[in-house]
Regions:
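N-terminal signal peptide c-region/cleavage motif recognized by signal peptidases
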Residues: 10-11
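Mature catalytic core of soluble alpha/beta enzymes
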Residues: 3-4, 14-312
Length: 312
């Protein structure tokens, strides 16, 4: 499995000693920053994330991988809840978020694997997507034989939320949990958005609220051969989204939802994406269009935009 990172680590706005530790989990580099006296909880958080990876990852030998191979696995509450949420997000986004996109992203492109390749149009059009074909009962989780799941479009956000829930139970209210582009600032923080065209940042933002959830999705890190064959695929057309090269969303205490929404917005046509985001006033956004134009909105409740710089 290849590892990816999309985001710059936020800077905490607090006094006192802090500690940041990093591990490679869930196909990315995970950075956890907490007050130094909470070092033990950083270790606990990493172990929790490894447990979530064991369930949600579509790579061998994890549970979703087993489901994709055998099309039935014993009931697992973590996976069942993630699938249930995914069905809700499918409905919320009018089908632009669809975890059965795995029939294309995993079964045909093999994104993140050494044997990745570009499928032909005939194979793409034959690939089956049907989120309603996933069945959950008291003893098992079942998919149809022509369906492959990929929870990568919401899994990291889901993992961030589960870790933050645990830290909240330990009365920890300062720190940052960062899984690539899916981040939670427990208290106030300043962070940068990375240009899709270079390693520099094009915007600096400061959170206005504690428990800010951040999710960034981009076409420029995970692809096969060249960036036109990136991993953000419209489940309606089986083709790559073309309107945006970067989508960053912000909200309060819900990384799972904005991870899924960022995935969906990335593959929507421009007009539909802007209509969707303007309707969801509970979500702030910064978008980089394929022509390099930057569009943003609904930010005032969540972040202060300190600066916007040239993308190139």
């Amino acid at each position: 499995m290849k590892f990816f990172t999309l985001f710059l680590l936020p800077i905490l706005l607090l006094s006192g000693e802090i500690l940041t530790r990093t591990q490679a989990i869930m196909g990315t580099f995970v950075h956890i920053t907490l007050p130094k006296e909470n070092n033990k909880e950083i270790s606990t958080s990493f172990e929790q994330l490894k447990g979530l990876e064991d369930v949600l990852s579509s790579y061998a030998p994890h549970l979703v991988y087993q489901l994709n191979q055998k099309h039935t696995v014993p009931y697992n509450p973590t996976l069942a809840y993630a699938i249930t949420l995914s069905k809700d997000y499918y409905n919320d986004t009018n089908g632009y978020f669809d975890i059965t996109i795995g029939s294309i992203s995993k079964k045909l492109y093999h994104f993140g694997e050494e044997n990745s390749s570009i499928p032909n149009n005939q194979a793409l059009q034959k690939a089956q997507r049907n989120i309603n074909s996933i069945e959950i009962n008291n003893t098992s989780i079942v998919t149809k034989e022509n369906i492959t799941l990929d929870l990568g479009g919401m899994g990291k956000g889901y993992a961030v939320d589960r870790v933050v829930e645990h830290l909240s139970e330990q009365n920890i209210s300062q720190g940052v949990i960062a899984l690539s582009g899916d981040i939670r600032c427990l208290n106030l923080c300043t962070f940068g958005l990375q240009s899709p065209y270079s390693e520099k940042t094009f915007a600096t933002l400061t959170s206005k609220i504690p428990q800010l959830s951040i999710s960034t999705s981009g076409t420029y890190r995970r692809y096969v051969k060249d960036q036109t064959h990136h991993h953000l695929i419209d489940p309606k057309t089986a083709k790559q989204g073309k309107a945006f090269v970067s989508v960053s969303l912000f909200t309060h205490t819900d990384n799972t939802k904005i991870d899924a929404y960022a995935t969906a917005v990335s593959v929507m046509p421009k007009a539909k994406a802007l209509t969707f985001l303007k309707k969801h006033r509970e979500i702030g956004f910064v978008l980089v269009l394929s022509d390099g134009k930057i569009v943003y909105g609904n930010l005032n409740a969540f972040v202060k935009m300190e600066a916007i710089r040239d993308l190139f």
